[in-house]
UniProtKB/Swiss-Prot annotation:
Keywords: DNA damage, DNA repair, Nucleus, Phosphoprotein. The gene is Pwwp3a. It holds the Pfam family MUM1-like_PWWP. This is PWWP domain-containing DNA repair factor 3A. Residues 370-384 have a biased composition (Acidic residues). Residues 102-145, 159-386 are annotated as: Disordered. It is found in: Nucleus. GO terms for biological process: chromatin organization; DNA repair. GO terms for molecular function: nucleosome binding. The keyword Nucleus applies. Interacts with TP53BP1 (via BRCT domain); the interaction is not dependent on its phosphorylation status. Binds nucleosomes. Interacts with trimethylated 'Lys-36' of histone H3 (H3K36me3) (in vitro). Transmembrane segments: none annotated. The PWWP domain mediates the interaction with nucleosomes.
Length: 698
């Protein structure tokens, strides 16, 4: 374990692939036992941790596949979408690293001498078990003798039961011949035989075309995991036409030429099949059936290419290794061609009618191989990426989740879950608005009233909200979309409320915050959250709760009563009013009254109670009567307007300054702001305006 470069360790309750950075040895209590600690870095992350060597495993491809299968079998996502994407990206990087190491390992590249580590074990053992007991020439090496014997024995085993009738010597010799263009595979199996055309030029050309086509096709099959049975069947039928024309006796010597490629000149001096048992016409006819029976009894009869006109399917692992098995096959091509020509010249009557079939077979085989190669290349280009699990809608509500909530008579509106109380089955949510306070308390509602933001009814809820609040709901959706995009691309990591309070969301927020008057939001979040919904189904009972009256107006009237008592009963503002009339104190209200030519029909009196206002006005009228000669010339002509525009504001400002113990400027600013209205009062006022507008439209 200490030698592994990549390991699988546990971090944050999950198995993560990691890269080993360093190894440290620490002394344990028992001196004989030594503990090793590994400094590892989580793949695709910058997180570095230290783990015990006994708590990790060497990273293997099977581990990644098991984890992926486990994730695919889960119904619920165990973590947030961002954490899940991070974890799967780390697994993807680990899988790429393992594939890269596999492709760069020496086992995947063929050795030039024709022997690979896989060839030196199992294939040699198979060939050794299948070598005939007949003597072989002395100039052949042990490996070459095994290959030659395999050539004979395998060709005899590949015959079907229908072709086991007594054969002539030329037909038996035909089972030993091998085209040097095809050669032997690494596992010792013979390649497909290529028939020789009659013409001098067509023989070499067609053979080379088929050779390149087979090599490219087998390379594609080695890379891809599957085959097309239909295409393979067509190619086999095309090859069977070419295989049926190989009936010359001189071609039997190619088996020895392939078995000993180092000494081709010595091979042709004596009997061409002297060292191979399968090439003896006398012995082979009697040994075919016993060999077949013995192999069937052992269960080792394998499907190989047949030379009697048919062909069994070629296994997937036989293909590109043909080149490495016979390094000097090109040197034998000239001699084999000469022998074939000599054999064909002995029987000219058979060669002429077969030439047309051979040329047709070569063309069909070549075209089929090219089509198969093109289709497999298209499959590689259209290879789908690794499967990614779709995001399933969570069944429970968590903190920070985006939801829909129906509030009073307003449509469903997006909100954020601030807290969840599982025992009470309630959640505190905060509606998404233009002036939303991320630190606000929100309202408490039942979990049954919440809907996930990405629920099936999402589009219907959006359409319903757009009927009355098109611009507002569009802004909310754009804000949520921008948050998810930044979360996915990694430019922001945090909850939605943190995103709303951060500067990164300002470009989206300012479009609404700078246009408060033009965008109308529903009045949400400060009423009774458990009020029954307006669109509840008929017959469905909902608890009816009594709405308490608004106490903010009563509180303001009680505070204003102190001002009235200060003005009327205590007469505390009378000296201030006389100083203004005698021009001892400046007054913006008197200056505006004298310079204004317009008659104001509406004014802010600050006092909301009519009785309080009448009491103050009567007192000010008495003051005017007492100071009739001291009033300004213009004020004497319009006494009511002078009282409302000058004396009433000055008296109230003086009372605010005295009662609340503030200076005159602060009291004047409070008077200009007017009474502070509550949220419910604004809502009632807006509802009255909407009802009035709807009534006029009707």
């Amino acid at each position: 374990m200490t030698d592994a470069k990549y390991v699988l360790c546990r971090w944050e309750k999950r198995l993560w692939p990691a890269k080993v950075l360093a190894r440290t040895e620490t002394s344990a209590k028992n001196k004989r036992k030594k503990e090793f600690f590994l400094d590892v870095q989580i793949l695709s992350l910058k997180e570095k941790i230290q783990v015990k060597s006994s708590a990790v495993e060497a990273l293997q491809k099977s581990h990644i596949e098991n984890i992926a299968a486990f994730l695919a079998s889960q119904n619920e996502v165990p973590a947030t979408p961002l954490e899940e994407l991070t974890y799967r990206r780390s697994l993807r990087v680990a899988l790429d690293v393992l594939n890269e190491r596999t492709s760069l390992s020496p086992e995947s590249h063929p050795v030039e001498n024709g022997s690979t580590p896989s060839q030196k074990g199992k294939p040699d053992a198979d060939m050794a078990s299948q070598v005939s007991s007949a003597p072989s020439p002395s100039f052949l090496s042990e490996d070459d003798q095994a290959v030659a014997a395999q050539c004979a024995s395998k060709r005899r085993w590949e015959c079907s039961p229908k072709s086991l009738s007594p054969l002539s010597a030329s037909e038996e010799d035909l089972r030993c011949k091998v085209d040097p263009k095809t050669g032997l595979s690494e596992s010792g199996a013979l390649g497909t035989e290529v028939p020789a055309p009659t013409g001098d030029e067509s023989q070499n050309g067609s053979g080379s075309q088929l050779d390149h086509g087979q090599e490219s096709t087998t390379k594609k099959r080695q890379r891809n995991s599957g085959e097309k049975p239909a295409r393979r069947g067509k190619a086999e039928s095309g090859l069977s036409k070419g295989d049926s024309v190989a009936e010359s006796g001189g071609q039997a010597s190619s088996c020895v030429a392939l078995a000993s490629p180092r000494l081709p000149s010595q091979t042709w001096e004596g009997d061409p099949c002297a060292g191979v048992e399968g090439c003896d016409p006398v012995e082979s006819s009697g040994n075919i059936r016993p060999l077949l029976d013995s192999e069937r009894s052992k269960g080792r009869l394998t499907k190989r290419p047949r030379l009697d006109g048919g062909r069994n399917p070629l296994p997937r692992h036989l293909g590109t290794r043909t080149v490495g098995a016979v390094p000097s096959r090109r040197s034998c091509s000239g001699e084999v061609t000469t022998l074939r020509r000599a054999g064909d010249s002995d029987r000219p009557e058979e060669a002429d009618p077969m030439s047309s079939e051979e040329s047709t077979g070569f063309k069909s085989v070549h075209s089929l191989l090219e089509e198969e190669e093109e289709e497999e290349e298209e499959e590689e280009e259209e290879e789908e990426p690794p499967r990614i699990l779709l995001y399933h809608e969570p069944r429970s509500f968590e903190v920070g989740m985006l939801v829909w909530l129906k509030y009073q008579k307003y449509p469903f509106w997006p909100a954020v879950v601030k807290s969840v109380r599982r025992r009470d089955k309630k959640a505190s949510v905060l509606f998404i608005e233009g002036n939303m306070n991320p630190k606000g308390r929100g309202i408490t509602v039942s979990l049954r009233r919440l809907k996930h933001f990405d629920c099936k009814e999402k589009h219907a809820l959006l359409d319903r909200a757009k009927e009355d609040f098109a611009q507002a709901i569009g802004w909310c959706v754009s804000l949520i979309t921008d948050y998810r995009v930044r979360l996915g691309c990694g430019s922001f990591a945090g909850s939605f409320l943190e995103y709303y309070a951060a500067d990164i969301s300002y470009p989206v927020r300012k479009s609404i915050q700078q246009d408060v008057l033009g965008t109308r939001f529903p009045q949400l979040g400060k009423g009774d959250p458990e009020e029954p919904m307006g669109d509840s189904r008929l017959g469905q009972w909902r608890p009816c709760r009594k709405v308490l009256p608004d106490r903010s107006r009563a509180a303001r009237d009680k505070a204003n009563q102190k001002l009235v008592e200060y003005i009327v009963k205590a007469k505390g503002a009378e000296s201030h009013l006389r100083a203004i009339l005698h021009s001892r104190k400046p007054s913006r209200w008197l200056k505006t009254f004298l310079s204004s030519n317009q008659y104001v029909t509406c004014m802010e009196t600050y006092l909301e109670d009519e009785a309080q206002l009448d009491e103050v006005v009567e007192y000010l009228q008495g003051v005017c009567r007492d100071m009739d000669g001291e009033m300004p010339a213009r004020g004497s002509g319009d006494r009511i307007r002078f009282i409302l525009d000058v004396l009433l504001p000055e008296a109230i400002i003086c009372a605010i300054s005295a009662v609340e113990a503030v200076d005159y400027k602060t009291a004047e600013q409070k008077y200009l702001r007017g009474p502070t209205l509550s949220y419910r009062e604004k809502e009632i006022f807006d509802n009255e305006l909407l009802e009035e507008r709807n009534r006029r439209r009707r």
